[in-house]
């Protein structure tokens, strides 16, 4: 499998507070990795470094030079109720994911709109194209933002606690959709719900300042303690 990125002896801090220390970690095509660990352990910072939003204080992250930097990464952040207050509809949000790939503000082409319509249909949102976000259920809203994350055909999909805003009726469908997406992109998913994600991920990155990689979807409480990676 082709490498997507590799972290080498990477450390990150906020002022004097070291958040990640001496991290060595690599992600390749077809990986589906659950990122777990205690609150404040560095999970979200790990994602921000991959996204280029936080710079390491030492070490480095190296991306495969054969990958086009723009559109390489899709990102589904934690969703809050504030995200639904904007006067935009489903199509607007999904298509906004293409602006990252285009880099500049430009009018969307007929081809862009056709692609957005295909994503909306793929995610089971047909008929809701003109619906405002405030009209959607939690599961529908999560699908809209997932559509925004994948419309650029990323090689890597980052998910930050995706289960927090998913209603129970859509939960299984959501993870089934991730399984399909994993056929064409690697997935790195931050979650505190090991019970749910263990049926879907292939391995774990246990993050608590240090990062310990566990190459199996099965992980015991004893192993979590050995990794200094209790789950809260």
Functional labels for PLM-detected ranges:
Residues 109-128:
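Conserved ABC ATPase "signature" region
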Residues 157-161:
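Catalytic Walker B motif of ABC-type/P-loop ATPase nucleotide-binding domains
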Residues 59-73:
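Conserved ABC transporter NBD signature motif
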Residues 207-232:
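Conserved beta-strand-loop-alpha-helix hinge in the C-terminal portion
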Residues 5, 19-20:
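Conserved structural motif at the start of ABC-family nucleotide-binding domains
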Residues 51:
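Helix-to-loop junction immediately C-terminal to a conserved catalytic motif
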Residues 132-136, 140:
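Conserved ABC ATPase signature
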